[in-house]
Amino acid sequence: MLNERFSILVLLLILLTFSLG
């Protein structure tokens, strides 16, 4: 299972990707 911090980092990266794209 993934750590909570890792999943939060992934969500932030996805949000940054969508905002930049």
Swiss-Prot record:
Domain of life: Bacteria
Keyword Hydrolase attached: yes
EC number: 3.2.1.8
GO molecular function: endo-1,4-beta-xylanase activity
GO biological process: one example: xylan catabolic process
Pathway: Glycan degradation; xylan degradation
Keywords associated with the record: Carbohydrate metabolism, Glycosidase, Hydrolase, Polysaccharide degradation, Xylan degradation
Annotated catalysed reactions: Endohydrolysis of (1->4)-beta-D-xylosidic linkages in xylans
Similarity comment text for this entry: Belongs to the glycosyl hydrolase 10 (cellulase F) family.
Record's protein name: Endo-1,4-beta-xylanase A
Organism the protein comes from: Dictyoglomus sp. (strain B4A)
Lineage of the species this protein comes from: Bacteria, Pseudomonadati, Dictyoglomota, Dictyoglomia, Dictyoglomales
